[in-house]
Amino acid sequence: MASVVEALIPGGKANPGPPLGPALGPLGVNIKDVIEKINEKTKDYNGMQVPVKVIVNDDKSVEIEVGTPPTSALILKELNIEKGSGESGTVVVGNLEIAQVAKIARMKKDDILSYSLKAAIKEVMGTCVPMGVTIENLDPRECQKAVDEGKFDESLTAEAW
């Protein structure tokens, strides 16, 4: 039966220390090779925490599955800031354009439950609320209503889902 190790690691910077090394050591795989493969697969997410699943089969072969970073991490990267607001609702730390929100929604396409770009955009907007991030200089909840009303339809027609 295969063993599975799941961890949240910095993109492109996995190392043999915790959390991966101690979990992989008892499984008898070459930790150095596994770390190199993980770093190769996660290099595009440099500076972000990335969920990684390492599946070690009985014959010691290894499969690596890389998820996408949390939506909040993608929002922070898009805004080039370190962290969200500690006082959401009163302190605004950044503003996203609707095209940036659509870009994040497309990046999360495989991980979210939405069937349409509009629904995915509304999910991303929902993550912006507690982070203190506005969209088109509006509260994200107002933007969600605007998406429902079709106010961004022209902007989103060029966006592929």
UniProtKB/Swiss-Prot annotation:
InterPro entries: Ribosomal_uL11 (IPR000911), Ribosomal_uL11_C (IPR020783), Ribosomal_uL11_C_sf (IPR036769), Ribosomal_uL11_N (IPR020784), Ribosomal_uL11_N_sf (IPR036796). GO terms for molecular function: large ribosomal subunit rRNA binding; structural constituent of ribosome. Keywords: Ribonucleoprotein, Ribosomal protein, RNA-binding, rRNA-binding. One of its GO terms (cellular component) is large ribosomal subunit. It comes from the Archaea. GO terms for biological process: translation. PANTHER family: 60S RIBOSOMAL PROTEIN L12, LARGE RIBOSOMAL SUBUNIT PROTEIN UL11M. Belongs to the universal ribosomal protein uL11 family. Forms part of the ribosomal stalk which helps the ribosome interact with GTP-bound translation factors. Part of the ribosomal stalk of the 50S ribosomal subunit. Interacts with L10 and the large rRNA to form the base of the stalk. L10 forms an elongated spine to which L12 dimers bind in a sequential fashion forming a multimeric L10(L12)X complex. This is Large ribosomal subunit protein uL11. The gene is rpl11.
